């Protein structure tokens, strides 16, 4: 079952500007940083807590969805697929055998590009070092971490030391200045403001600083949104243009 443009399960098409589709073999999560305070996924899921038969009858409680594991194999046209837009694959309560099954599917469906994003960077790094200890990470698996301000930059270092063909940062929601970023071994940076009720404003200089660092290092930069209660109304221009750059470097391993 899918709902709201596939936010519950898998959807061919996404309102997220930097992907083509979403796939949620896991739903639900727990808040661990200030960047989670106004989580869109939790807000959506909790609306349906207690609604019998709804995919989010249990609200945003962590839930494994084994019936969805093979979904990407049925899509023959290549897509960029955001993995677990409604959860975190590396949540501490997700069993390693289940993570193995998700990776097995991603590796088998090598005509797609899979975008895996986490805030739990130590667990991601440990898993990737285990899985790719004696082989090259597939080029179609992109691994990323979320960063919201300068206090969360340790995740970038964990990512840089993880075996992956493409490593990316999602600096969203930007809730404070990030400061200098070590972009060695990073192939893509997404940035954007917070959206929805209670959204914290993003200062333009925070976004400019990230963009300028990317330009200096030749790292593709994607500006997703200004944010706010109605994020689409603010447009996506930063200094007079949209920034829609995508990764061009693949096959590069731990920095």
Give, region by region, the residue ranges found by the protein language model.
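A very general structural signal that marks isolated residues within well-ordered alpha-helical segments
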Residues: 42-45, 122, 165, 227
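Short, surface-exposed, charged/polar-biased interaction segments
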Residues: 50, 57-60, 104, 127, ...
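Auxiliary Fe-S-binding modules of radical SAM enzymes
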Residues: 1-31, 48-51, 161-164, 175, ...
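Non-transmembrane, interaction-prone segments in cytosolic or luminal domains
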Residues: 55-63, 96-98, 237-238, 243-244, ...
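Intrinsically disordered, low-complexity sequence elements enriched in Ser/Thr/Gly/Pro
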Residues: 36, 45, 116-118, 165, ...
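Conserved AdoMet/S-adenosylmethionine-binding subsite of the radical SAM
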Residues: 64-220
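N-terminal [4Fe-4S]-dependent radical SAM core
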Residues: 2-80, 88
């Amino acid at each position: 079952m899918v709902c709201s443009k596939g936010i519950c399960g898998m959807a061919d098409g996404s309102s997220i500007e930097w992907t083509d589709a979403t796939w949620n073999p896991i739903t639900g999560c727990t808040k661990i940083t200030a960047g989670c305070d106004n989580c869109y996924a939790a807000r959506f899921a909790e609306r349906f807590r207690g609604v019998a038969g709804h995919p989010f009858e249990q609200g945003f409680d962590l839930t494994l969805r084994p019936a969805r594991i093979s979904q990407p194999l049925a899509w023959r046209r290549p897509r960029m697929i955001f993995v677990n837009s409604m959860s975190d694959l590396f949540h501490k309560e997700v069993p390693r055998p289940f993570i193995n099954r998700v990776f097995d599917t991603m590796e088998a469906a090598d005509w797609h590009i899979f975008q895996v994003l986490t805030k739990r960077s130590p667990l991601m790094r440990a898993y990737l070092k285990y899985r790719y200890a004696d082989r090259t990470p597939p080029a179609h698996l992109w691994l990323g971490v979320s960063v919201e301000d300068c206090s969360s930059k340790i995740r970038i270092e964990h990512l840089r030391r993880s075996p992956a063909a493409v490593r990316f940062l999602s600096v969203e929601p930007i809730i404070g200045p990030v400061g200098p970023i070590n972009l060695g071994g990073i192939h893509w940076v997404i940035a954007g403001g917070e959206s929805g009720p209670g959204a914290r404003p993003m200062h333009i200089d925070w976004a400019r600083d990230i963009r300028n660092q990317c330009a200096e290092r030749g790292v593709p930069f994607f500006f997703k949104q200004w944010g706010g209660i109605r994020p689409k109304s603010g447009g996506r221009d930063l200094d007079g243009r949209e920034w829609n750059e995508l990764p061009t470097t693949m096959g590069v391993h731990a920095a």
